[in-house]
Amino acid sequence: MILNQGQSLTLKLGSTITVGTCLTPRLIPELQKSCPDVKVSSNVSNTRAIEQKLLRSELDVGIVEGEIYSPDLHVLPIVDDRLVLAVGKEHPFYLKKVLHVQDLEQEQFAMREQGSGTRQLFEDYATRHQISFQTVWEANSPGTLLNAVLYDGVLSVMSLRLMYHEIRNDSIHVFQNENGEWNRKFKLVYHKNKFLTPAVHELERILHSYRNVEIPENAGILR
């Protein structure tokens, strides 16, 4: 948190791409309404990049979904999130209600870039279950991945929070992991030596109001 020449406080907020797409645009207006003297500067990147920016004091606070490894950063899990398997209408899985992990063998996927928490979680899952898949799309934009699912017939694994519109209009069918292996948290992260201003505490309070995730009634199951 820094003081500008105009005597207004600036909070440098970092968000991962998933968080920056589905949550940060809502958080910032709420925070500025509660703290009108605070100007929020937003930076969106993947988990690894946000971690490094926090360590270099280029950001005051971050909200991430991936794993943070530095012992110099304090991590506070707050918001529930779930990855789901996204399937478009042209894919044979679209009409199914239940899939098994073996069904994913050699399927074509649209994936996030290396350094993404979403990608890491799914790759760890694939390794545990000894399945191989083909990455035919790679992008750091959730919109690009969604369009690949919609129009190119590939699969993708991404946050449920990114697809509510497509799920409601039945253009995408999703499968949730039955064992909860894709459940995760959005986490508030800051340097352990960071002085926490009232704006950071208010950001934490606002985050708690988003902690629950809505599961669609027609979601399929991946076993």
Question: Which positions does each model-derived feature cover?
Answer:
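Flexible hinge/capping segments at coil-to-helix
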Residues: 4-5, 70-109
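Central regulatory/effector-binding core of bacterial HTH transcription factors
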Residues: 8-71, 139
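Short, well-ordered beta-strand segments
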Residues: 10-14, 62, 86, 110, ...
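A late-sequence structural motif
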Residues: 22-23, 173-216
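Hydrophobic hinge/microswitch elements
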Residues: 46-51, 55-59, 64-65, 121-174
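Short beta-strand->loop
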Residues: 74-84, 160, 169-183
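Residues embedded in well-ordered beta-strands
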Residues: 84-86, 92, 155, 173, ...
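Secondary-structure junction motif
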Residues: 93-94, 107-129, 160, 196-205, ...
